[in-house]
Amino acid sequence: MAQEETRQRFALVAGEASGDLLAGLLLDGLKTRWPQMQAVGIGGPQMLRRGFESWWPQEKLAVRGYVEVLRHYAEIAGIRRQLKARLLREGAELFIGVDAPDFNLDLEAGLRERGMKTAHFVCPSIWAWRPERVQKLRAAVDHVLCIFPFEPALLAKQGIAASYVGHPLANVIPMAPDRAAARTALGLDAEAPVVALLPGSRRSELRYLGDRFLAAAALMQQARPELRFVLPALPSLRGEVEQLIAGSAMKGRVQLIDGRSHAALAACDVTLIASGTATLEAALFKRPMVIAYNMNPMSWALMRRKQLQPWVGLPNILCGEFVVPELIQEAATPQGLAEATLAWLASPDKVHALQQRFSALHAELQRDTPTLCADAIQKVLEG
């Protein structure tokens, strides 16, 4: 058995920061189950810390929106072709696509056609945006690792094998975050009201939301001079964020921190945040938020036609109602964003009720994700 384990090789692709975090926890489970395993493909810093060998920088795939993807399509398609060829040439027991369905599903289908077993971690949001992906998913994967409890039953109806593994973030983020410790770590005043600005982890998001968030922050500070602002930025985007801040009315008034979005969310009283996985992180930190979403108008028009639910933000989708405000496209004005964010600071009773709701959601998502992932992967390998 030990000799067999030395040959265990997994290939993974995580296309953005949120996928990197999920994949890091997946690798924890795989490493515990198969201590001698190797993992290769495309990943970010969380994966690299666990010994992952990344063949391309993760940032190459971190593009969002139809128009934005078209701009980079040739490069992304080239990476996918080269990756597929190398995996088929060098071999792997299993390919696991971590989120990034636009990139991974085609790759998974191509590898599966050639006999490689495949799994997908994070069910594509067929229940929210893209129902046509069901057929593609069925053809592409042997198994889906689902992070939301209602997804396996939906996939079973479509003949797709799936397991609920819990949401890894629910184990990473404490049930009762330590605001005081986070503020001490960031050098923030213990009593000052703090707003966390999270305009997104992709360049396209930063382009559409960065200026708006900073303009909203300026309006908030005019209304409440005692406010403090923190903005976590990935190292790869720090230069661009610094330029945005320097050219805004918030120059010298925003504390820019490297990565550490969790520290910012733990420390803050409220967050102004781009739609995406970070909104679920904010919910697990029990923080009130205002969700913003802005992209190329053509991309939004195409996406809106495929929308199946009235919500965009994950906290609202999971709660089945608007528990936090969403300001989308034209509604995401600096004035609107500022007013909605300040409203939370003036409504402690509403904040308390929201925290109770988010605590229940946290408990529902909390599972032993690394072990459940390894269990599911082992079944695929043995199947």
Describe each model-derived feature in a short phrase.
Residues 1-383:
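Nucleotide-activated sugar donor-binding and catalytic core shared by glycosyltransferases
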